[in-house]
A protein has these predicted regions:
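Eukaryotic helix-linker segments that join adjacent hydrophobic helices
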Residues: 1-5, 15-17, 21, 44
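Recurring C-terminal helix/loop segment of individual leucine-rich repeat
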Residues: 32-35, 74-77, 116-119, 158-161, ...
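Eukaryotic alpha-helical solenoid repeat scaffolds
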Residues: 286-288
């Protein structure tokens, strides 16, 4: 007897549960085995089993639908075409924790493939109930709810805006700030997707303290995968305008990104994410204090973006030019070795043009040594000591003669009076 006939016939619920469980375990391995389950006509019967009153059968059927739909868009469409979404949505209202988790995972595995498959889930009106589940006592339910939210909002601006309109950002940020590491990863990704779609949505994330909590994760966590996801989300927030970039810079995130990028122990994925995020944010950043903090430790591929921003700021901002000199920025720029014809050299030349030539020379490498060398080579042009002494002697004689003349003049004047 086939699994299909077992699910069709009025067998004991335990037998049906075992059959559905077996179908799911077969399908979960790869898309070929999952396709074989579909070709056998099992999907409509799993949907029927989802409607049975037995709680355990509902759980296993939802799990099997997840195992089938996760592999590719065609398998997910088969599940949707079989009418699974309305019954999965209805099952979400069941108080059983395990069923909630399986339902949310099944819906996530459908939604992730395309906007075409995500829209029917939205139409099933399970939001904002899904957001409510982010505060569920069970961590697995919380994570599954965040995963579904992530898969919905990643596709289009319209879907992301819908999640935002029903309070999605607040729920996600709250989850990030209160939950454990593995639970909050999908929430971090959801925040990144939302912020990446539109500058106004990124501002909403910033206003909800999203950057603050992401910064905390960046400084407290050591897991490279978590750090890579967090760095990616930060890049999505800071990439839009100078206002967004400043929000990231004020949170003291840029030096940490540079530190992670320069760390030889960081994974290649983390380094790549840091490189991309720094590039995205620096190209918009006009916050000079944050830019200066990156001057000393940035490798050339990052430094060119830092100097590129200075080349935009300094020509028009006298205060920034003064600060750039007093903080040691101009001195550091003179020490940079740039290849002829490179973008980096072009930025250095633009920056140097913002200052008087004597200031640029003063901060150039080797300038103090050149001054000392000039002192050593200088030929004094002072008058000789003999000439000075002769001049002093002549001056004394002149004063003495004048004094004698004055005495004689006085005596003559007295005689006349007498």
């Amino acid at each position: 007897m086939t699994a299909r006939s077992i699910l069709q016939e009025d067998f004991d619920s335990g037998v049906k549960e075992a059959t559905a469980w077996a179908l799911g375990y077969i399908a979960r391995h790869n898309k070929t085995l999952a396709q074989a389950i579909v070709d056998a006509g099992a999907v409509p019967l799993l949907v029927l089993a989802l409607q049975e009153p037995e709680l355990c059968l509902k759980q296993i059927s939802a799990s099997a639908l997840f195992d089938i739909s996760k592999h590719n868009i065609d398998l997910a469409e088969t599940v949707v075409d079989a009418g699974a979404i309305p019954f999965l949505a209805k099952a979400l209202s069941n108080p059983d924790t395990k069923l909630k988790r399986q339902v949310l995972l099944a819906l996530s595995s459908i939604a992730k493939h395309s906007v075409h498959l995500a829209e029917p889930i939205i139409e099933a009106e399970i939001f904002p109930d899904v957001l409510v589940h982010m505060a569920h006592p069970d961590e697995c339910v919380v994570k599954a709810a965040a995963m579904l939210t992530r898969e919905i909002c990643k596709h289009t601006l319209e879907l992301a805006q819908l999640i935002v309109n029903i309070g999605g950002i607040g729920a996600l940020v709250e989850l990030i700030s209160t939950s454990k590491l593995t639970v909050r990863l999908p929430a971090i990704m959801a925040i990144g997707y939302i912020a990446g779609h539109l500058d106004q949505l990124a501002i909403a994330v910033i206003g909800s303290k999203g950057i603050v909590h992401l910064s905390t994760i960046l400084y407290e966590e050591n897991d490279d995968h978590t750090l890579a996801v967090t760095v990616w989300a930060i890049g999505q927030i800071g990439k839009h305008t100078s206002e967004h970039a400043k929000a990231v810079a004020v949170a003291n995130i840029l030096p940490k990104l540079l530190q992670l990028y320069n760390n030889p122990n960081s994974s290649e994925d983390l380094k790549a994410k840091c490189n991309t995020a720094l590039k995205q944010i620096l190209q918009k950043c006009m916050y000079i204090e944050a830019l200066e903090s990156l001057l000393h430790d940035s490798p050339p591929n990052i430094l060119k973006y830092v100097l590129g921003q200075f080349s935009k700021i300094l020509p028009h901002d006298p205060r920034a030019r003064r600060l750039f000199v007093t903080s040691g920025g101009l001195k550091k720029v003179q020490e940079i070795q740039a290849d002829p014809g490179s973008t980096l050299l072009e930025y250095i030349q633009i920056i140097n043009c913002c200052f008087p030539d004597e200031i640029v020379r003063y901060y150039s490498p080797g300038y103090p040594n050149s001054l000392l060398e000039a002192v050593e080579q200088y030929q004094p042009k002072c008058p000789s000591l003999f000439a000075i002494e002769e001049h002093l002697s002549s001056d004394i004689d002149s004063k003495s003669s004048l004094s004698s003349f004055n005495e004689e003049e006085k005596e003559e004047h007295v005689r006349k009076l007498c």
